């Protein structure tokens, strides 16, 4: 994000604080009901065993010996002690649950395992044994992720006849980033693996957010060469921890760390970010689930009405989900409607008042739902809006004291990142990739990984050559990219109840229900008087049209209405920050959601590589299971690093394919000097190179015009332009350069520019010329050898 708008009204002190929010008692997404997810829409890979269920092999056979007996026999329970088989079964159950938390099915294979052919055929004894081995390895490493788990250690508890499965499972888990990842010293000091080819393949990664950083670190561990291009001057992307400071002379040392973007670890069971926190020794703060609500005039909401309306809201949401199931069963998923429309219909059926406390409470829950999805309810798909719910990670929702920037900067350490490089175009083809930046530099590699937010793809900020497949373009259009904004307020002291992490605020106007509807206290996280106010739904859009100073004043007005009647004075903040994620040119929004007409399949389409394995995609909007989450972004980086490694291994088997160094091409005049030494035609001070990919008379040609004298000792320079072949022929017959220059502007509407201003079309033409000449040179060399 660009530097957020901030204001610093004069005031008094505060103490240090930290991070930002997720939802407590009023859960971030909603209450869960058994019938909420249409099972027909959930993809479950169950590989049928070759034998009947009664003959199905048991996973115990995969282990070599029983676990050791309890350390002490001092305490004994009545009755027969557990048998070895029972103890083993319990251990296997625990291992299966740990593996499930990490994203594995308890009794089946993942799609990646099937694609990697980890076993010769699906089903039967081999699959059951492999699953037990896989779960055992995952569980063993997760028990202490500060250590590097070796293959020999993984073999220790496994029978000799299953050692082959251990080798396969260990290799799969290592390549896909399920084990031995992260920032522990033992992990960082491990030598890189042998690359799939020599020289090692080079990968250009676009974006230094969590997806880009996790992919870069994992690819480096796999022996690849990596360069990360980042448009901002910092890592993290939408995960941004800002240090707020007091500008008051009276309280000069008051600071606080605030997460202005991604802030909450949404479920720590199996969460790779929780693993990073454990490796770095970072404590986790559970978000406490008591959330009092206040009316616009500051009075607390009546608890009976609050409970009744929360129950009503959940009943309505349940009925909407039952309707969805009926629609899917009878008409199929092709028939869709907005979640907002369905909620409105059932809300009327429940005779919810159009005004008063009940209506405001219902609106608060709707605002909460819009926050969870960063979307207007009118845009959300009724059928697929919560398609990721079956995969939600369990456990507490937590903050990292000091902010998520702590592990962002740890991830970025020693990664080759080029900051201030905004990618403008990506050319991908059989010879590799060429990635252009706004600085006039191009980066050449074997493959590229694009991790930019969906909002950037929707905006068309990056031009792809050739164009992305129509299927991917349509998925980019279908999926939504919503908006959530925040106001961060650093106060001189804590005037609210710091024993609670959240409190809510109701509005009288339904159209403004998302405006400052929820406040988060950071006091318990870092000890500083810091509040965050959330702005969701329609209000998040209007928020960005309002000057930051006015936004802060409105937020303070809300706080004063809540606390002044209690005799509590609300001071002016020492510093304030208003986010503007929607107008941030590096994001154009906050996170993805499923619109009407879209589905979870679109996340899968976005994740697909293009260009015969030259261009890959990662980011939260490419993760069907964990979209709109920080861990979803990180896991997508691991996923694509594994896919890149797999592609490189296949390519290495072809004799003509080998890795290249990452080449940074300075796009100055020098590269064009070489090209224009062999121009297709010249006249006066004009030199022309035609597009080698198109003989069409209307196709663009690259024109260079010498400005100044042509004598060796005269001062001169060059300007460039794109002119059609037809116009080139007209220029050639004109009388002198002065007439030609006039015709360029007057008749052809063409401007001459310097080398760095040729734009995407010009850079693409230069690439085609270079590639054509390179092919010609190779063909000549081959002919000479013959």
Predicted segments — roles?
Residues 155-163:
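Short helix-coil junctions and helix-kink-helix linkers
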């Amino acid at each position: 994000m660009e530097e957020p708008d901030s204001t610093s009204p004069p005031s008094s002190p505060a103490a240090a604080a930290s991070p930002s929010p997720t939802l407590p008692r009023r859960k971030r997404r909603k209450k869960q009901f058994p019938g909420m997810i249409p099972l027909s829409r959930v993809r479950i890979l169950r590989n049928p065993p070759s034998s009947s269920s009664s003959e199905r092999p048991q996973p115990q056979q995969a282990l070599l010996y029983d676990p050791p007996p309890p350390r002490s026999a001092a305490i004994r329970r009545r009755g027969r002690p557990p048998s070895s088989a029972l103890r083993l079964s319990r251990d296997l159950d625990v291992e299966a649950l740990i593996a499930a938390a990490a994203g594995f099915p308890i009794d089946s294979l993942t799609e990646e395992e099937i694609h990697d052919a980890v076993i010769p055929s699906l089903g039967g004894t081999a699959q059951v044994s492999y699953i037990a081995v896989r779960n055992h390895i995952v569980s063993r490493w997760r028990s202490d992720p500060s250590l590097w788990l070796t293959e020999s250690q993984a073999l220790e508890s496994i029978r000799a006849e299953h050692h082959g499965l251990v080798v396969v499972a260990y290799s799969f888990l290592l390549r896909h980033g399920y084990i031995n990842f992260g920032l522990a010293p033992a992990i960082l000091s491990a030598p890189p693996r042998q690359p799939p080819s020599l020289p090692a393949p080079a990968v250009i990664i676009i974006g230094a957010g969590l997806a880009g950083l996790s992919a870069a670190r994992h690819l480096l561990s796999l022996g690849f060469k990596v360069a990360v291009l980042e448009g901002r001057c910092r890592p993290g992307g939408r995960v941004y921890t800002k240090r707020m400071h007091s500008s008051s002379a009276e309280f000069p040392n008051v600071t606080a760390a605030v997460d202005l973007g991604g802030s909450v670890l949404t479920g720590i069971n199996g969460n790779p970010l929780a693993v990073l926190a454990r490796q770095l020794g970072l404590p986790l703060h559970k978000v406490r689930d008591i959330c009092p609500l206040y009316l616009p005039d500051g009075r607390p909401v009546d608890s009976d009405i609050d409970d009744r309306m929360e129950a009503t809201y959940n009943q309505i949401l349940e009925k909407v989900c039952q309707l969805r199931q009926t629609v899917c069963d009878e008409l199929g998923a092709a028939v869709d409607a907005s979640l907002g429309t369905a909620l409105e219909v059932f809300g009327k059926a429940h005779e919810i008042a159009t005004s008063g406390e009940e209506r405001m409470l219902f609106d608060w829950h709707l605002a909460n739902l819009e926050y969870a999805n960063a979307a207007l309810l009118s845009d959300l798909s009724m059928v697929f809006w919560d398609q990721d719910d079956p995969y939600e990670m369990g456990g507490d929702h937590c903050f990292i004291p000091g902010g998520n920037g702590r592990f962002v900067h740890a991830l970025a350490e020693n990664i080759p990142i080029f900051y201030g490089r905004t990618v403008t175009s990506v050319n991908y083809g059989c010879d590799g990739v060429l990635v252009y930046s706004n600085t006039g530099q191009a980066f050449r590699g074997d493959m590229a990984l694009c991790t930019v937010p969906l909002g950037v793809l929707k905006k068309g900020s990056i031009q792809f050559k050739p164009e992305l497949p129509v299927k991917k373009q349509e998925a980019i259009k279908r999926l939504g990219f919503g908006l959530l904004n925040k106001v961060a307020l650093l106060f001189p002291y804590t005037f609210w109840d710091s024993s609670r992490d959240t409190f809510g605020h109701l509005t009288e106007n339904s159209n403004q229900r998302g405006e400052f509807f929820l406040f988060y206290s950071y006091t318990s996280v870092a000890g500083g008087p810091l509040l965050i106010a959330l702005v969701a739904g329609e209000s998040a859009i209007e928020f960005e049209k309002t000057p930051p100073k006015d936004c802060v004043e409105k937020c303070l007005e809300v706080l004063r209405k809540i606390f002044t009647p209690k005799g509590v004075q609300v001071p002016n903040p020492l510093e304030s920050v208003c986010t503007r994620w929607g107008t941030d040119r590096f994001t154009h929004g906050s996170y993805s959601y499923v619109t009407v007409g879209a589905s979870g399949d679109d996340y899968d389409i976005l994740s697909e590589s293009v260009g015969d394995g030259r261009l890959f995609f990662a980011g939260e909007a490419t993760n069907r299971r964990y979209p709109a989450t920080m861990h979803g972004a990180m896991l997508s980086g691991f996923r694509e690093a594994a896919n890149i490694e797999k592609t490189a291994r296949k390519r290495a088997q072809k004799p003509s394919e080998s890795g290249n160094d990452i080449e940074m091409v300075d796009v100055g005049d020098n590269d064009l000097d070489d090209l224009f030494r062999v121009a297709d035609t010249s006249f006066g001070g004009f030199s022309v190179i035609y597009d080698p990919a198109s003989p069409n008379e209307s196709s663009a040609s690259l024109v260079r015009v010498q400005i100044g004298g042509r004598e060796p000792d005269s001062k001169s320079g060059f300007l460039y332009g794109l002119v059609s072949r037809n116009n080139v022929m007209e220029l050639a017959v004109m009388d002198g350069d002065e007439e030609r220059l006039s015709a360029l502007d007057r008749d052809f509407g063409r401007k001459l520019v310097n080398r760095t201003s040729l734009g995407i079309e010009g850079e693409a033409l230069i690439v085609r010329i270079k590639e054509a000449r390179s092919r010609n040179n190779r063909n000549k060399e081959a002919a000479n050898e013959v």
